[in-house]
Amino acid sequence: MTEPFTPPHRLSAWSTLENHAARLRTMRIAELFEHDAARFATLSFGHRGLLLDLSKQSIDAPALAALVDLAGQARLPDGIEALFAGEHLNFTEDRAVLHMALRGACAAPLEDAATLAQSQQRMRAFTVALRSGTMTGATGKPIRLVVNLGIGGSDLGPRMAAQALVPTGLRATPEVRFVANIDRRELDEALADADPASTLFVVSSKSFATAETLANAQAARAWLQAGLGAGCDPALHFTAVSNATDAAAAFGIPAERVFPLPEWVGGRYSVWSTIGLPLMIAIGASEFDAFLAGARAMDEHFRTAPPGENLPVLMGLAGLWNTDFLGIESLALLPYAHGLRSFAAWLQQLEMESNGKRCLRDGSGSVIHTSPIVWGGVGTVGQHAFHQLFYQGTRRVALDFIVPVAAADDVSQRSLVENAFAQSAALMSGRDLDTALASLRAKGLAESEAAVLAPHLVCPGNQPSTTVLLPALDAFSLGQLMALYEHKVFVQGWIWGINSFDQYGVELGKEMARSLSAGSGENHDASTAGLMAAAEAMRRTPDRS
């Protein structure tokens, strides 16, 4: 994109939105329902079974129209088309951003098309061999356990999706486990009941140079060598997803067991690529196809639907509204499904690594806020932990409820759905002092006692929330959901004017870690140098006196 860039706060729609925000800050969300009986119908949107409800946001139709106008002034439709056309929107690294091509929603670059098709075929053949029991290790035993060694995008997406799609209590063959932390305890736990002769490790590192992943791979190799004994080749117990075939070969993984991935696939968008190999192994090739199909359906909707009917666009605009016009600094993800227990961790990387930036496309610094702080946890567990802050804390928090509906006869899921709806309603409506007093009087408390206790029962409410309803937590719906959030993040990054596809802050942290690993205390601040010295002293002589 070569057109001049205008920061969003300088667009005319921005001042219009500031006026809407001043008006809506004085109104409660519950009042908006009183003024508009058709509010749910107006502010809920569907596509291929997925429902996006924005009616509990602190927004109304005129404000939403102004947000859509902002998207137009920011040339978002041009940005969407540039994304799908393969323009180098990751301009700092001079790369296209084409993870949608992995799902069949757009064409891969011609020079990569053949390699991509071959890799996908190899993934399928590898998966079939593992799941059928025909792939064996060095001793001839079939592989029964696959352990993925990766971190960041090489772990979060496949791990989250496997948790969501492998039914609880079903012991898949082979079983797939994930190890990311350099803390040896995670690897030890993954291997506690494992048989080296029937265990396969997938080393997932695009560069085959990720420090944490290589450390775990080396520990895994030592474990295999100790367990298999002399004369057994541990290479039969490794495969890699990487572009560094020479580095993988130096480690002991032959080229025929290395699955490459295109350079235009960023880590946090890589579950759709060969990085998704452990997911395909866990759920099977046909379910992986359904996963891709769900994402492709959302891709096609994002590319073709008008902004005012486009789910990722509307979701992104609602989030931008909360961040920049209502001053809400955090987004809590509340999936009401145990299978989505790692969804918040996946979204943390997607949102905060993509949009946690301040440098704009023209090199200037942003004067408005970008990514919110993303956190959360699974319902109903969170209701007994951090939901208290939503009800009676001093901050407004934006909330995303993700609710798979499932079958009508699933009693536990029906209860989860009811709890999710109750939470979103209660957090919107709250409880005022008069209601609190009335409830205490009804319980028989004396007026003096009720007057003392009632203020402690007041819940301000007015917490804005989005609800995403899924027909079920299946492969197609999960693909839709993940692509919805991916494109939402693009929408926000585009309007803010940042590059959502690099992560130079992460690289600075890696550089510092390498410096400390080299053992040099020079050129470090006094605190860091002091901590290094204290840690070394503790290693030598722990003082517990």
Curated annotation (Swiss-Prot):
Which sites are catalytic? E353, H384, K510
MF annotations from Gene Ontology: carbohydrate derivative binding; glucose-6-phosphate isomerase activity; monosaccharide binding
Subcellular localization is given as: Cytoplasm
This protein's GO CC annotations: cytosol
| Catalytic reaction annotation | alpha-D-glucose 6-phosphate = beta-D-fructose 6-phosphate
Q: Which UniProt keywords apply?
A: Cytoplasm, Gluconeogenesis, Glycolysis, Isomerase
Question: What is the enzyme's main class?
Answer: isomerase
Question: Where mainly located?
Answer: cytoplasm
Q: What domain of life does the native source organism fall in? A: Bacteria
Entry EC no(s): 5.3.1.9
Which biological process terms from the Gene Ontology are attached to this UniProt entry?
gluconeogenesis; glucose 6-phosphate metabolic process; glycolytic process
Q: In which pathway does it act?
A: Carbohydrate biosynthesis; gluconeogenesis; Carbohydrate degradation; glycolysis; D-glyceraldehyde 3-phosphate and glycerone phosphate from D-glucose: step 2/4
Instruction: Supply the PANTHER family for this chain.
Output: GLUCOSE-6-PHOSPHATE ISOMERASE
Return the similarity comment.
Belongs to the GPI family.
Q: What does this protein do?
A: Catalyzes the reversible isomerization of glucose-6-phosphate to fructose-6-phosphate.
Name the chain's protein. Answer: Glucose-6-phosphate isomerase
Query: From which organism does this entry originate?
Result: Aromatoleum aromaticum (strain DSM 19018 / LMG 30748 / EbN1)
Taxonomic lineage: Bacteria, Pseudomonadati, Pseudomonadota, Betaproteobacteria, Rhodocyclales
